[in-house]
């Protein structure tokens, strides 16, 4: 089956600044996708190109096997929820949601039915006659989403839609968005710079930097198997250290050999090693793979964040449910599966091949 939407070598610049560089992506129907990256990486530009608010300088955008790169926005089965909601302040909730339906000249009874259903979906039943000015940020966000889904788009675009909400409201909206996407079966494309939000919401994530896709995959794939230092550092907390590949399943870190689960890398190849803080355990000095001294400890609510320095002066961050005494000597332990090897300069295609060969080896 062909993708619902594809970018084919799409580039876009503004004046002398290149924003997107030969972007290639495929969007399948009925999934929740997230474009994740820092400010200025090009993620919102991709959203604007999908919506038709901008046109590509080169390459093309294919929707259901037809090029739409130059198609005007009103001809696309796409709706957008903006960061600032873009609601009409002089219209009440009902009229805001009904606006697009009235333009389509639907009957009053059909409009009322659709608006009522949309309000039920976003859990705002009974709010039809409320004025926009008197609503909270979370309520305005729900109205904006209802206005988008009432038009039954095939793709719903969400541009940093939760960033203005406080933590509790943002969490509630995350649950609502996932519930809506599952129930309606609409393809969602969500833009955010918030890594936790992307991991929680998405079926698939595009990680972006400097106008290029760094990695594409499921949240678990990207978290567990980052393709490069940027992805590893951007997605969650990481201990990233230099190492040398001794042979398949053995890596040398700072002069000490460790068992790992990576293979297919040349012997003596310089690599970068990622170990997540939650994968490191504090143990007795005798039980540790190496020894370290506790430098500091912060309470983060669900865990303690403990910073240690090993005897060679390298720092390690550990997330533990157990306290540690600052200044104490401890052992650090992690399983071979906790070690992830990254090869500097390796492309995503090369990385994927290496991971596949490792999986084939273990299934043989």
Swiss-Prot record:
Membrane topology of the entry: Peripheral membrane protein
Q: Which protein are we looking at?
A: Spermidine/putrescine import ATP-binding protein PotA
Query: TM segments?
Result: none
What interactions and quaternary structure are annotated? The complex is composed of two ATP-binding proteins (PotA), two transmembrane proteins (PotB and PotC) and a solute-binding protein (PotD).
Listed SUPFAM superfamilies: MOP-like, P-loop containing nucleoside triphosphate hydrolases
Question: Has keyword Metal-binding?
Answer: no
Cite the binding residues for ATP. 37-44
- PROSITE patterns assigned: ABC_TRANSPORTER_1, ABC_TRANSPORTER_2, POTA
- Annotated source species: Staphylococcus epidermidis (strain ATCC 12228 / FDA PCI 1200)
Its job = Part of the ABC transporter complex PotABCD involved in spermidine/putrescine import. Responsible for energy coupling to the transport system.
User: Which GO molecular-function terms appear in the entry?
Assistant: ABC-type putrescine transporter activity; ATP binding; ATP hydrolysis activity
Q: Where is the ABC transporter domain?
A: 5-235
* EC number per UniProt: 7.6.2.11
| Listed PANTHER family | SPERMIDINE/PUTRESCINE IMPORT ATP-BINDING PROTEIN POTA, SPERMIDINE_PUTRESCINE IMPORT ATP-BINDING PROTEIN POTA
One Pfam family here: TOBE_2
Annotated Gene Ontology cellular components are: ATP-binding cassette (ABC) transporter complex
């Amino acid at each position: 089956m062909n993708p619902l939407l594809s970018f084919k070598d799409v580039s876009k610049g503004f004046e002398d600044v290149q924003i997107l560089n030969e972007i290639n992506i495929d969007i399948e129907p009925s999934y929740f996708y997230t474009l994740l990256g820092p400010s200025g990486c090009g993620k919102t530009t991709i959203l604007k190109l999908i919506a038709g608010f901008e046109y590509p300088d080169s390459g093309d955008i294919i929707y259901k096997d037809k090029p739409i790169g130059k198609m005007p926005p009103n001809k696309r089965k796409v709706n957008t929820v903006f960061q600032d909601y873009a609601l009409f302040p002089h219209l009440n909730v009902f009229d805001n949601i009904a606006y697009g339906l009235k333009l389509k000249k639907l009957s009053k009874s059909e409009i009322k039915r659709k608006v009522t259903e949309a309000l039920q979906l976003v859990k705002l039943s009974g709010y039809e006659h409320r004025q926009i000015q008197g609503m909270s940020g979370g309520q305005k966000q729900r109205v904006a989403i209802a206005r988008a889904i009432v038009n039954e788009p095939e793709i719903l675009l969400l541009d940093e839609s939760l960033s203005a909400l406080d933590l509790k409201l943002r969490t509630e909206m995350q649950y609502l968005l996932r519930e809506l996407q599952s129930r309606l079966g609409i393809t969602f494309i969500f833009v955010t710079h918030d890594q936790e939000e992307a991991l929680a919401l998405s079926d698939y994530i595009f990680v972006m930097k400097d106008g290029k896709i760094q990695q594409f995959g499921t949240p678990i794939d990207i978290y567990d198997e980052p393709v490069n230092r940027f992805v590893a550092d951007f997605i969650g907390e990481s201990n990233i250290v230099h190492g040398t590949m001794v042979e398949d399943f053995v890596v040398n870190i700072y002069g000490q050999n460790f068992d790992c689960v990576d293979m297919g890398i040349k012997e003596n190849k310089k690599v970068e090693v990622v170990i997540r803080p939650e994968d490191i355990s504090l143990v007795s000095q005798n039980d540790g793979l190496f020894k370290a001294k506790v430098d500091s400890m912060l309470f983060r609510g669900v865990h303690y964040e403990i910073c240690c320095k090993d005897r060679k002066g390298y720092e390690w961050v550990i997330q533990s449910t157990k306290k540690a005494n600052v200044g104490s000597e401890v052992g650090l332990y992690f399983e071979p599966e906790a070690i992830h090897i990254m090869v500097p300069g390796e492309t995503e295609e090369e990385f994927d091949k290496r991971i596949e060969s490792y999986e084939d080896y273990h299934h043989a």
